[in-house]
Amino acid sequence: MARVAVVTGGTRGIGEAISLALKNAGYTVAANYAGNDDRAKAFTDATGIKAYKWDVADFDACVAGIKKIESELGPVDIIVNNAGITRDATMKKMNRQAWDEVLDTNLGGCYNMCKAAWDGMLDRKFGRIVNIGSINGQAGQYGQVNYAAAKSGIHGFTKALGQEGAKSGITVNAIAPGYIDA
């Protein structure tokens, strides 16, 4: 039986490419999305990859999403935390809601997804987690203090969680791409 991989934000952009690459490599892929139902249906129709809708910023929704995928496809052994949003504004113009939404989705989503699948990975002594950061988490970007903070946080989160998982066969890595034309 093929290992099950979940890709958040997996129906478009970088996530779509990751979902397809994993499918082509022989994995059973579940693509998470939060918004566009028509786009998700078109993705599933074109790729044969099932799309599951929930907001990664919602912890309970992540737990329910992992449970649903595991009941339909089998144990989740791979998570690619790709879901992300922007709410760009300079600090002078940024409101607290824009800050919270970006941190809750981009960084909180990584925690929520990892926490939802962690115990199963520990029990099976196997897991692969890839967190998608950004070059802007390392270098910063004008008008993106919220996004840069979230993506920088992913780097520290990845390092710490990787240390926790190593003794149990769980690897945790991050990728920090630059600008992408999607």
Language-model features: locations:
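Conserved glycine-rich cofactor-binding loop
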Residues: 11-12
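Conserved glycine-rich Rossmann-like NAD(P)H-binding loop of the short-chain dehydrogenase/reductase
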Residues: 25-40
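Substrate-binding pocket helix/loop in short-chain dehydrogenase/reductase
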Residues: 90-91, 95-103
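Active-site loop immediately N-terminal to the catalytic Tyr-X3-Lys motif
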Residues: 92, 139-145, 167-168
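Active-site helix of classical SDR
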Residues: 114, 150, 158
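Alpha-helical segment proximal to the catalytic Tyr-Lys
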Residues: 119, 163-164
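Residue(s) in the substrate-gating loop at a strand-loop-helix junction
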Residues: 134
